[in-house]
Amino acid sequence: MNVDHERAVAPDNDHGREPGVTIARRRLLWLPVAFAGAALSQGAPAVAANSAFAPLSRDELGERWRALGVELDLLTDEHDESLAAHVVALIARTPLAALPTHGKARPAVGLAGGPSWQLLPCMAIEFQMAPGAEIRLHNHPPSVVVSLCAEGEVRARHFELHGDAPPCTQLDGQRFEVQETRSLLLRPGQTTSFTRRRDGMHGFVAGDAGARLIDFATFLSDDGETFSYVTLSDEPLDEERRIWEASWAGKK
């Protein structure tokens, strides 16, 4: 297509242009095609064993993830995004079949969840989710969590506090506001994350075929009390800004 276009706008001419100029330009246009043909004939390049894109084993994933968590434990939350990005990259390089599992079967109804890997301060928590099963919206103690869809499809939603709120241990029904920051569909190999600074509440609903979800959590506090499910109002207070009224529901 490019060559035909070149012929149309710059035909050979005998009106003072140096001989061969048009021909040279046409040949240059063929170069990318030639390179592409050579690449196809040779096949895709092999990924070197020490490449940043080489597959990782389960042990390599765990070793690198834990080292990052130990280092971040000494740093401030301004480094959380870097940790999340590193963990996402490590997970992307690890075949889904090599990821840790708690071995529980997917139930016909509801979900089967629990820790599948403990590498303190890191922990993988796996959820086998029946079709339509829900992990209710909840917050977390200070942590960075990357959630991976390993099988099926799952709808993820993230929220943040909008304004002041009582402590999540205060279960007196007091209302406060939260803002929905993200809503996305995850398929196998896709991730979503939150840090201490953003998107700190999340919830999930499995698709029609169910799902396998793995949370890769890096805990940055010994605090185990600041966990609570969150109850949302039936309708948002502000549809455009995705602001909802909410209350803490405790751990059950």
Question: What do these predicted regions represent?
Answer:
Residues 125-139:
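Conserved short histidine dyad/triad with adjacent acidic residue
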Residues 163-196:
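Short acidic-glycine-tyrosine-enriched beta hairpin
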Residues 42-79, 236-237, 245-252:
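C-terminal segment of N-terminal export signals and the immediately downstream linker at the start
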